[in-house]
Amino acid sequence: IESHLIAALQNRADQPVIHAMRYAVSGGKRLRGFLVLEGARMLGLPDHRALSAAAAVEALHAYSLVHDDLPSMDNDDLRRGLPTVHVKWDEATAVLAGDALQTLAFELLTDPALGTGDTRIALVAGLAKASGAEGMVLGQALDIAAETAKTPLTLDQITRLQAGKTGALICFSAEVGAILAGADRAPLRRYAAALGLAFQIADDILDVTGDEAKTGKRLHKDAEAGTATFVSLLGLDGARARAAALVAEAEAALAGY
């Protein structure tokens, strides 16, 4: 995935926006790309059939992080232990780099190696839905609205928010293999929905218990802002128990494979 993204950004203009794009896609856990490749492997597809889709979801994810870090959004100055894009360059460059990474994601989905035209259209439609006003963007909008809400979010509201902001792209990533193979998406969708929520709960737990030097980002933001989280609503032990239950649910969804 790393080399595919590097290749996609070669032979581009020697401009700050291109340097910022390369900076933004470097590093990270590659969870979403991993889900794309593993889902395809599980359904018997070779890596080259899914590689451009894996790079696409990572480019899309990188765009979302660049924009989320902006002062008008989450106002973060540290990401993966390094200065965020708007800090290293400036806000305008960060906005443009994010925009360009988003369009790069859809450019990558035109790769003929992904399959027929219908398959690629399904991938484009799926990524657009997961990242737009029904998915990730909706989740971020709900998150911003919660900052000025008169009452803290309920558990159901936080679950809905995170299903969009974090979960939608994770779900799409897991479903890519089924789209490529023409297989049933439902088991992978159930798996990823549970995994995505467990991932977010783990992130909330790390915000309370983690080490900034290891996580590479500023911690305790939610507590300082008085933002409701899974930990603030369930308690630390309750959040851990909920995450463990979701992991078991995710594993059960894959029992048929």
Task: List each model region and its residues.
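Glycine/alanine-rich phosphate-binding loops at beta-alpha junctions
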Residues: S3
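Mg2+-dependent prenyl diphosphate-binding active-site environment of isoprenoid biosynthetic enzymes
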Residues: I6, Q10-E251
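Short arginine-rich
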Residues: Y257
